[in-house]
Amino acid sequence: NDNVRWIPAWASNRIGSMVEERPDWCISRQRFWGVPIPVFKCKSCGEIVANEESFDAVIELFRTKGADAWYTTAPEDYLPSSVCCPNCGSHELEGEKDVLDVWWESGVSHTSVLGTRPYLHRPADLYLEGSDQHRGWFQSSLLTSVGAYGDAPYKAVLSCGFTVDENGRKMSKSIGNVIDPIEVCDEFGADVLRLWVGSVDYSQDMSVSRNIFERTSDAYRRIRNTFRYLLSNLNDFANADFVSADEMLEFDKWALSRLQALVAETTQAFDEYRFHNAYRAWYDFIVSISSEYFDAVKDRLYADAADSVERRSAQSVLADMLEAMVRQLAPILAFTCDEVWEKFPEGMMEEGRVAAVALAGWPDEEDFAPQLPASEREELLTSYEVVMEARDAVMKAIEEARNDGLFTKSQEAAATIMGNTELIEALGAHGLDTLAEIFIVSNVELEESDDADGFVASVSQAPGEKCPRCWNYRELGPDGLCERCHEVVAAFDMQADE
């Protein structure tokens, strides 16, 4: 038992106590169907005849004629002459009429299945069944394997609870609370059903209802929209466009560091069969990265020059996110991820690319471009904690200003952030332009105040005029555009003239 990994961990004590307290196992049953017990009785004295020679003869009989031959073929027709009663020496034998307990049949699958197929191996990597099988298949397999070979037939055993309705009641046709998975697939789609399965803690009974599937459908929609955001913003991106670590912007490095930390966390969760933890980590990441990063880099993605380092830097991160997300969520959202895999930007489809995401392999650190040293990733994640704290203060101030009717878009705002010297210095180290991008405002000012408890933010109307192209408030040139947009549009005009 100590050499087997039991999932959940408490199952180890459960199976241990059950085996310790169980009575002797009577493996014979009196039925007209089942697997025969391959032993013989002496017709003269009733002694049991069972030895290596008789077993080999029965094995060969079953191999050539099937198990029914036990009832249709006389023992003397297939037993060697050397097989006789060890008590009286008689050769007049009859086959046992009792059959094996069905738990013995399934319990020896480690030999009848794993031991006879060259593409399988024993012990099995995993046995998987409901929690009731601690008394059934898990236990019968353990007993027969230890008895025959001295060890367990499995490396790990995973047991799951049962589905109940939203009130915790067992599903029953008489109650009318049974939910047909086919109907769920027809109404919500197969991946919503799969997402529900992947999102629940299977170690205990799992509640299921229409309301739960509706909430799961909402979560699925958010994931699907994230895929759409990534695909649409990578339409013109190719693998040759990945920027180097030296070129990548700091804010993008932070997002990439978060992604790599997530992949490490979820990989461990999948390895430990904690699928609901892997899903929860991905979902929480999607929710937070959407507001903290996706919204912030839209300005670069939509308004910067198409092939600028700044835009390619953000796209490099989005490409890494797409690759990691589609590969890691494929075991749960099989159909959606295959659809995404087929819609990958043409420039990201390398020659020899596998046809299905299931064949693409699991993402690891080598799959990310650029490669960031672990020490740099940790430093970025730590240093950006203060940035996100300041962001929360700015977002709160913007929301209050919106409620007061001062403005509707955050780009209309200039943010002033106050904090003590240490906080302001740490925040200012990231650069005012970077902070303005993260906070999605047109201007940022920092002020030291020893009286401030944490960060205190206020917003006011940003100076300048609204650029009609990027919507940021800047000093506009003769063409009515900000300096950045003027340069981008001028480049377009030059290309058109050529």
Task: Give residue ranges: language-model regions.
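Short metal-binding segments enriched for Cys and/or His
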Residues: 114, 189, 490-496
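Short Cys/His-rich "knuckle" micro-motifs
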Residues: 52-54, 95-98, 477-481, 492-495
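A broadly conserved sequence feature marking short terminus-proximal activation segments
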Residues: 5, 12, 25-29, 41-64, ...
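Short Cys/His-rich zinc-binding micro-motifs
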Residues: 465-477
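Acidic, turn-prone loop/beta-hairpin segments
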Residues: 83, 93, 237-264, 295-397, ...
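Structured secondary-structure scaffolds
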Residues: 1-236, 255-298, 316-329, 466-469
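Structured, non-catalytic alpha/beta "coupling" segments that mediate domain-domain communication
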Residues: 213-239, 331-349, 416-450
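Cysteine-rich micro-motifs
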Residues: 85, 478-488
